[in-house]
From Swiss-Prot:
PANTHER family: K(+)_H(+) ANTIPORTER SUBUNIT KHTT, TRANSPORT PROTEIN YIDE-RELATED
Keywords linked to the UniProt accession: Cell membrane, Membrane, Repeat, Transmembrane, Transmembrane helix, Transport
BP GO terms, sorted: potassium ion transport
Family note: Belongs to the AAE transporter (TC 2.A.81) family. YidE subfamily.
Gene3D superfamilies in the cross-refs: Regulator of K+ conductance, C-terminal domain
Gene Ontology annotations for the cellular component aspect, listed alphabetically: plasma membrane
GO molecular function: monoatomic cation transmembrane transporter activity
Gene of this entry: yidE
The protein's name in its UniProt record: Putative transport protein YidE
Residue ranges of the TM segments: 4-24, 28-48, 65-85, 95-115, 158-178, 371-391, 393-413, 439-459, 464-484, 493-513, 533-553
Covalent S-S links between cysteines: none
RCK C-terminal domain location: 191-276, 279-361
Amino acid sequence: MSDIALTVSILALVAVVGLFIGNVKFRGIGLGIGGVLFGGIIVGHFVSQAGMTLSSDMLHVIQEFGLILFVYTIGIQVGPGFFASLRVSGLRLNLFAVLIVIIGGLVTAILHKLFDIPLPVVLGIFSGAVTNTPALGAGQQILRDLGTPMEMVDQMGMSYAMAYPFGICGILFTMWMLRVIFRVNVETEAQQHESSRTNGGALIRTINIRVENPNLHDLAIKDVPILNGDKIICSRLKREETLKVPSPDTIIQLGDLLHLVGQPADLHNAQLVIGQEVDTSLSTKGTDLRVERVVVTNENVLGKRIRDLHFKERYDVVISRLNRAGVELVASGDISLQFGDILNLVGRPSAIDAVANVLGNAQQKLQQVQMLPVFIGIGLGVLLGSIPVFVPGFPAALKLGLAGGPLIMALILGRIGSIGKLYWFMPPSANLALRELGIVLFLSVVGLKSGGDFVNTLVNGEGLSWIGYGALITAVPLITVGILARMLAKMNYLTMCGMLAGSMTDPPALAFANNLHPTSGAAALSYATVYPLVMFLRIITPQLLAVLFWSIG
């Protein structure tokens, strides 16, 4: 058997063994995709014992390409919500998550200096302790750029594997410990979170208002500033028993009922100007109007603003709201449409059908993957990651590398959505498949390279001390920030658990947090809020630590 055939066969065996290990769960908790790393270590141990020779060049290419696939698909997935997560609504959560990253870096630096841990080993421990695989890839690349011998670079994968299990268990222990310390009632926390969401300013809500202001009588909607702006959509108007879709030229009369969509603060301002909220239903049932959700798939409307499509004027149809990557938005006229946007349309059936034809509404297109944008994005990401940034006094130029470059480029392209007929939307199933393939390839190679010396290091070497160092890097930041968030910021417990899981980019921890109260979305929401920024910082941190440690000796 040729070296290439043998290498591919061994990698397939590693994937099978590793995925099996990852699927084994104890009380609902398992290693997940991290099992592939240990599958690689097991197979790598026996490969080393048998004296087999694998193609090192091929392993290196597979490892790097797997990492690129993984981080690129993550960026495409979270890109649409990344910049929104940095705004005020998620600022507090992101600050606490960043604090966890900073404290983890400080603990790593202290351990490195106190115990004189070799640089590749301490970076591997750091990456494993925070259960972040792209950090491992970024650290290995910067070490190679600094001229570290390959046998030392491979030690990083071994120390990563030592620290990884407690990285997963440590965050679960922290959640449990904080629950005990603060005597948390999970049901109460879930109710408080739901109440805050209802009263908060981030959700899109609807209300029905009666026109009671005599100054508005006989005015057109376009002449009422609060109704003609971008913060509120008036999607229905009821006069006596007639329900209609209002256009900008529709005349308002006293006693009219308006169905408004917007954020709570803006709707409150509308009440002050127009009139009081009423309980009267403005449902389309029993009328010639209907409400329908339509998905944007027509390439000809991508990038166009809603106001430029003139749906109100041409079809008497109102877009009441827009869902983009799971986030509900007010469908203001200045929003540019992206592939996969889901629009709520209100109008007559024939008019809605006409608008749906303009927008595309081809569900099958959502399952198709445009491969050209994928490779354009990967290519641009690799180029971005290869740009050196020279910092005075540093022995090597800083680079985003093959982990950071594709991630940043994917975040940008995911936010842009489309350029001409090229769109970077990727069906969730396709995104997940590419992401899992990438991480399996990467971890398989890392495990194989570490497996030869793993058992000897654990039994006869410094493996146990590495595990202890990793436990400190995991536990100290999580416990410190968890206590601060609860005591000083009075953060909701479920929200805090999601933030802690997101700060470690740890899906098993998110699964545990979600199971604390299965019907509450608090943990998932905070996890998604901090995940993009933390993923970026986790990739950059080992590079900064490597250069700093290297420069100060």
